[in-house]
Amino acid sequence: MPPKKKITAVIKLQINAGQATPAPPIGPALGQHGVNIMEFCKQYNAATESQRGNVVPVEITVYEDRSFTFVTKTPPAAELIKKAAGIEKGSAAPHRTKVATLTREQLRQIAQTKLPDLNAHDVEAAEKIIAGTARSMGVTITD
């Protein structure tokens, strides 16, 4: 078995799927760790091509020899809620001003999408987590 590479950094970014460019914020974040920025952009864009239009978080692990690996996550819950509700942004005063409503069915779809990245064991628990995020954005849930 080959010796393990030593990890020097773990970088977390949220980038639009298929639209990674060396411009900020990606360039400076990777450049300070000596990563080949164009190589990352090409690999990320290829990996997220099917998810265009979504913000896809990525966790980049940088090794001692300046090589890297990355893992893409599911889009943020807030982004999925905004897309499902058809709104630009959440409420400025979420508990006073409601900006949209979601049905239980939409909530279940978002929960199933996010399930791999949430610390929930079943869809019901994931739904509660997503409902809490929606509530803090000024989005109400209807049955």
From Swiss-Prot:
SUPFAM superfamilies xref list: Ribosomal L11/L12e N-terminal domain, Ribosomal protein L11, C-terminal domain
Quote the function comment for this protein.
Forms part of the ribosomal stalk which helps the ribosome interact with GTP-bound translation factors.
What is said about its interaction partners and assembly? Part of the ribosomal stalk of the 50S ribosomal subunit. Interacts with L10 and the large rRNA to form the base of the stalk. L10 forms an elongated spine to which L12 dimers bind in a sequential fashion forming a multimeric L10(L12)X complex.
Give the keywords, sorted: Methylation, Ribonucleoprotein, Ribosomal protein, RNA-binding, rRNA-binding
Q: What's a BP term from Gene Ontology annotated to this protein?
A: translation
- State what protein this is by name: Large ribosomal subunit protein uL11
| Post-translational changes noted in the entry | One or more lysine residues are methylated.
- Write down the CDD domains for this protein, in alphabetical order: Ribosomal_L11
Q: Which family does it belong to?
A: Belongs to the universal ribosomal protein uL11 family.
Q: Which organism is it from?
A: Acidothermus cellulolyticus (strain ATCC 43068 / DSM 8971 / 11B)
- What is the gene called? rplK
Record flagged with keyword GTP-binding: no
Q: Which InterPro entries match?
A: Ribosomal_uL11, Ribosomal_uL11_bac-typ, Ribosomal_uL11_C, Ribosomal_uL11_C_sf, Ribosomal_uL11_CS, Ribosomal_uL11_N, Ribosomal_uL11_N_sf
Q: Which molecular function GO terms apply here?
A: large ribosomal subunit rRNA binding; structural constituent of ribosome
Which Gene Ontology CC terms are recorded? cytosolic large ribosomal subunit
